[in-house]
Curated annotation (Swiss-Prot):
Top-rank taxon, per record: Archaea
Protein name: Nascent polypeptide-associated complex protein
Metal-binding found in the keyword field: no
Organism: Methanopyrus kandleri (strain AV19 / DSM 6324 / JCM 9639 / NBRC 100938)
Keyword line: Protein transport, RNA-binding, Transport
Matching Pfam families: NAC, UBA_HYPK
Residue ranges constituting the NAC-A/B domain according to the UniProt record: 6-75
Amino acid sequence: MFPGGKIDPRKLQRLMREMGMEQEPISGVERVEIHLKDGSKLVFEKPQVIRMKIMNQEFYQVAGKAKREKPEEEPFTDEDVKLVAEQAGVSEEEARKALEETGGDLAEAIMRLQGE
C-alpha cells in the first residue's frame, strides 16, 4: 500500500478520516489502572492515551510501561470481624471498620469499640 514501507503521517490521518476513523490524544493523564478478575491490576504511570472513534465506537489506546500489582489482602478474616462484633457488642460493619483502622489488631479494635 505504501511503497518502501514509509507512511506520511498527514496522508495516514486523511486516509483514516476518509474511513470514518478519528483519533485524539488525551493530555494530562497521570495513571491508568486495569483491574483484573484475580484482584490484581495493571498500572500505567504517566501513559500516553489516545481516544479513537471508529464507526460510532470509542477505543482507548494506552501506551507505556505496565506494572502488575498484586491484590491487597486484608490483615483479618470474616471470623475476626464476627469475633470483634460479638465481643464489642457492635455490628459487623463497625467491627470491620475498627479492624481496618487498627491494621487487623483484634484486641485494639475491641478496646476502641468498647471505649466509644
